[in-house]
Every structure is written in structure tokens, then in C-alpha cells.
Amino acid sequence: MAELLPGYSPSFKKPSEILRLSRRRSRSEASKAGVSPFSPGDVTKRVPGLRPFSPGPNKGAGVKRRNPFANLENTVCSPVKRRAESVPECASPEPRALVAARPSCWELGSPSPQPPQFNSVEDVIWGDPLADPLVKTESPEKPATACETPKGSVTFPADWSLKTRLLFTSSQSFSWADHLKAQEEAQGLVMHCRATAVSLPHSIQEPKLSTELRCAFQQSLVHWVHPSFPWVQLFPRIGIDRKMVGKNSPWSHDESLQQVIMSEWALSFTSLYNLLKAKLCPYFYVCTYQFTVLFRAAGLAGSDVITAVMSPTTRGLREAMKNEGITFTQPLVEEDPSKKQKNSEANSQGDITPKKENGNTETDEVSDESDEDESFSWLEEMGVEDKIKKPDSISIKLRKEKNEVKLDHKPESVVLVKGTNTFTLLNFLINCKSIVAAAGPQAGLPPTLLSPVAFRGATMQTLKARSVNVKTQVRSGYKDQFSLEITGPIMPHSLHSLTMLLQSAQRGSFSAGFYSHDPTAVFNTPIHPQAAKEISADLQNCGLHPSTVEQLSQVNQLGKLSLRHLELSDYRYTWKS
């Protein structure tokens, strides 16, 4: 064929001849420029992911020869190359210093680097040795978003969630908390009833010999409950139907007995609210089989009025509250952008009419109906309103309520009631039949009332405490590890009181794991942007320690989370939520 076609040359079948000429050319130019001759490995160094034409020094290493017909652009920016670049830095053979020295393509304000342009194999071989290919460096790591304090604080934020279990661990023994004497137990109960504030020393050398410490420990375990049935678990109430199966409940099928129990419960509930209103009770919980309500006195959680937080809720419950005239807000639900824009425009025009918190006034309903009419007015203008089937009012209502239904039984469904509306909520809960289960293991059982102070019809109960000593393995052998377990309905004041005692008894060093009742974690949602005006001066007779009142008066900081871990080291706290 070469004889028939003089211009035809089969040189493409011999790439070694081309490379030999290229190397000869490189040597000649290198001798002129005073640089080292070309080495086959330079191509792969300048173009990552490009295999050499000949094995060269890599011969015998099992490296496959590069396809000479491969597209260089696909080779440089191939998916395989991109995956190789995304490998963590620790897996790259390139030193960390060299990678850090190169300009990062993720730095703000710097132009994005352009990949080198190669039009042929010669351009790759004879390209500018100073040209650096596109190297993807690691993007700067974002700061950690964990809810953790900057190393150490003299106190920790208030946690309004109910706890079911606390586990304290320390290198110091907890034996002082075991086997309280009868006199110490009685003294602790009296101190609780009289709201005696105990001031312990900074550090106690012999905790087991400190009668004052042991009495204060008994005082911190006391709480009040209604109703009280020793054979029935009254907390938690959500999700415990399986544990209550088979329990004797004579009221479940006796309506007259149910009426007596509910009437006594209503009196106890009203008594608690009156104490709260008089600031003789700081807060209390109402635990039903579907939701939990936290009532707080004015001056707590950064609010200067009485507040009530309810979670979780459903659309049906919220609608029933609206029908009763209860004004409430949903702090974790973002306002509709269109409504927010209308409100901002109204405010800019000088409309200072206060907006009701429930967002469902009569004017809103009228505007919604007018919007529906306007949305179908264009059909009448075209004269086809009779030919096109319009959605009925029920479909429109369901479409609008679709977003509300999505919130049911979720933390975002939390409801906040303020001021005098809390009294309306009280009457609503007393008269609402749905707060008592009609069937199942909890049928006929009224909601559980939990309070840090005594009230009408309440029963005094104490949390259960148990200390355990274990051996933990360390490098040199075994080390004694001491733990203290607290179980029961643990309220915020008990958590703070116990940490104050352990701070002195354990010489400023311990760690704790908290187990929260999940539906109540959302009670830590901030409800007021500013600190309360009425603080501890008006709550000095509420039955809590002054430092506990000071902590509970602070604005909520945990959001919809709760404390999971608390550590005290050298009398300074760190925590995680």
C-alpha cells in the first residue's frame, strides 16, 4: 500500500519512533537551556491521572500503559480522577505541606483556576513545566455545631424537660447517700415542707459524717403527685400501655367511681393553679396519655406572665382550643412568607393593631374566603365556570390544613399559652373528656399532676437513689469507679439541687448522664426574647432554693433539645445536649 500511495506512511504503527524523536528533541533543548533531560515520569507529574506512553522505570511494577488514543480532556477531568481527588488527605502520598502550599480553589474572593489546555500529545510533553494542574484541596472545616460550652462555666442552663433517670459517676465514693438514718430522713422531709435553704461548704472532706449533707440529699428527692395509686405507674404516661396491661383498675368500668376521681382531680388541679398564680408554686406538670403541659409562674423562663407549654399536639386539639377562645402561638412553626410580607406592609403603613397569637381571627377567615372567590373569578370572566368542576369547600379546607396535619405528634407542634389565657386553658382541660382514655389500660385514669410543692390532694413521694461501686480496667490494672443512680419523675429543681449537693460532696468533680422524657424536651424552646422583669424577689416564697430560682428565671438556651451529659471538673461545668 505504501508503494501505491507515496504520501502514505505507516509510522503511526511505531509510537516508539515518535518517542525517540521526542526524547532526542528534549535532550537538545535541555542542553541549550541548561536543564535536565526529559523523563517519562514528568508527564504524569504535570497531568494527574495520565499514564506514561512507555513503562520506563515503572516497568515490572504492573502499571498498565496509557491508551494513546484517549481524549486528554476526559483523562484529566474523568470521574475516576475526581473520585481519586476526593480521597481523604491521609490516604494521599503527597505530603500535607505541599498540598497546603498550593492555592485552594475554595478560598473566597479568589478567581476559580482554569484547567490547562492541551491540544495534542506534544503539548502535554512540552507544556510549561511551571503550569500546575487543577488540584482540589480540602475545603476549610466548618466549626462544630454541637451544643457544647466553651471550656467551663460556674453553672449550666435550665432544663425544663422531665427526666426519668440520672446516672452520676465519680472517682469519689457515693456511700454517704446510702442508708440514711431515721432522724436524717425525717429531718430532710421537714426541711422540704418548710422550704429550708441549705448552704453547704465549698468542699466536704468526710461526706459520710455530714448530717447536714445527708438531710439535704433527702430534701432534694421529695416531690408531690396526684393521683396516687401505688400499683399503677403514673409517670411517664405516654407510651406505657404495654407496661400497664393486667393492672387492676376498678375505675375503668365504674362510671360513678370515675366521676369521683375526676372531681378530686379537678380540685387538685385548681389548687395548683391558684398556688402558681400567687407565686407560691414555681411550676407544675400535667401528664396525660397523649400530651404533657408545663405551667410556669410569672418570672420564670424569661417571661413576666404565667405561661403554659403543651406538647405534642394535634390539629384537632388545636382547633378545640381555638373554639374555646384560647389564644396561643406555635414558636417552632415559621410564619407563611406571604402573610409575613402582608404584616410587614401593614406595619409600615402605620397599622399598629396587635395581632392575635393564634393567627385565626374572624378577619383572617373573611380574607381567606375572599381569596377563594377571587381564585375562581377568572372562570366566570371566561364564561366556563359551569363546565369546569371546581373543588368543594371541604377539599380546599383539607388542602390548607395539610401542613398543619404534618406537625401532629412532632416537637414542632408545641403550643405556647400566655397570661390570662392559661386560666382558660385550665377550664378547657378540666372539661375536656379526651384527656382521659376511654379504652385500654389507662381507661378512666386522670392525668398525673407533678409539683415541687404541696397542694390539695397531693401525695408526697421520693425519688429512688442507689449507689454502685465497680472496678474499671486501666493500663496499670483496675480502678474504683463509683456511681449514683436516681430514678423517677425528675423535675428541674431536683436536678439543680442534686448537682449543688454533689459539687460539695464529690469535691468539684463528677460526670452525669441524663435520660429525658422525649416529648418534654421541647419545653426548652425560648418563649421570650428578653429577660423577665419580675425575678426572684417575687418568687422567694415559692419553696425552692434561691440559686435554683435564679437558674430557672433565665431565658431558655437549649432550644428544643435537652441536656444529655453534664461534667463538673474543678468546679466548672461543661455539657452536651
UniProtKB/Swiss-Prot annotation:
| Keyword list, A-Z | Cell cycle, Cell division, Developmental protein, Nucleus
Q: What does this protein do?
A: Replisome component that maintains genome stability by protecting stalled or damaged replication forks. After the induction of replication stress, required for the stabilization of stalled replication forks, the efficient activation of the intra-S-phase and G/2M cell-cycle checkpoints and the maintenance of genome stability.
| Listed name of the protein | Protein downstream neighbor of son homolog
- InterPro entries named in the record: Donson
Region (Disordered) location = 1-67, 328-382
GO (cellular component) term, any one: replisome
Signal peptide range: none
How does the annotation summarize its subunit structure? Component of the replisome complex.
Q: Where in the cell is it found?
A: Nucleus
Q: Chief localization class?
A: nucleus
Q: In the UniProt record, does the keyword Cell division occur? A: yes
- Give the lineage: Eukaryota, Metazoa, Chordata, Craniata, Vertebrata
A GO BP term here is: DNA damage checkpoint signaling
Gene encoding the protein: donson
Q: What's the family?
A: Belongs to the DONSON family.
Biased composition of type Acidic residues is found at 362-375
